[in-house]
From Swiss-Prot:
Organism: Bordetella bronchiseptica (strain ATCC BAA-588 / NCTC 13252 / RB50) (Alcaligenes bronchisepticus)
Location within or outside the cell: Cytoplasm
This protein's name: UDP-N-acetylenolpyruvoylglucosamine reductase
Function: Cell wall formation.
A Pfam family recorded for this sequence: FAD_binding_4
GO molecular function, one term: UDP-N-acetylmuramate dehydrogenase activity
Active site: R177, S250, E346
Protein family (similarity comment): Belongs to the MurB family.
Amino acid sequence: MSMSTVPARIEPVAPLAPQAQDLRCFNTLGLASHAPAFVALTEPSQLPALSALAPRFRQLVVLGGGSNVVLPASIDGLVAQVRLPGVRLVGQCADAWVVEAAAGENWHGFVTVCVDNGWDGLENLALIPGTVGAAPVQNIGAYGVELADRFHSLTAWDVKGGRWVEMGAAECRFAYRDSFFKHQEPGAWVIGSVRFALPRPWQPVLDYPDLQRHAALDGAAPTARAVYDAVCAIRRAKLPDPAVVGNAGSFFKNPLVDAGTRQALLGRFPGLVSYPQPDGRYKLAAGWLIDQCGWKGRQLGAAGVHDRQALVLVNRGGAQAHDIMALAAAIQGDVERRYGVRLEPEPVVVPAR
């Protein structure tokens, strides 16, 4: 793989002193979890110290906003939360703005800053929970736009190699809710900052009917602000606030199937919801599959399925990782038995050791 090493900056190494930390408030599912060794990364100069510290532990768990993880009751290892701050415009040309955000920035806050400054192109991704640094790992996407569509490059710390590395789209190997980072040893990389190429002139992406209805209520040509407001309104209406009901957003990926499989399923289930993809495959609506299996609003122990969005698993109070995963497994089994399709979880399931 071709990656460019960023020249080392001459700066003092900031020390890291691990401390015990309750992680219940550090994951949006609100799962009870304890880290005997926890550090917060607030400046890039701390990364060499992390490389020196990590080998002393069984595993290194890198956390962002905790919105896409299932944490165990106790983590045997070092937990490092990325809190690196900063947003700046680093360049512009005739066809794009190039904007850089540090990995610890809140994703929705960053999108809002872009819309406020006229750096349009990320508005379809508004209100997705988490941090900027976690966004490329998952290749987040919503309402017809994926992070990969707006990606320029990123800088990541190679924990074992002890160096900063610059990576472009080819090196990141983006796919549907997937990237190079999801196939590496956990804790091998810490993303430091991400740069985005935001198109000029801007064109709205209104592929979803809900978005079309919300963004053009007045009949005028939609603006980026109107699309942003519409996305926020739709998400708030459909998805629970993690501050009120513990959840990790969409828990399952929408499965991809070939045209033949989709046609066979349509013959048996005429109401099947699917979306054509550029490669000829079809993306099935996982929420529809789960709903049709009767799971919407149901509960299994302390874990449940949200009553308005079947893709969202929620903590009904006191749930632990095993409760969430037992519910997920039951849903997967029912969907596979009925439709012959295996649902894949989106969140990273962190092992206890």
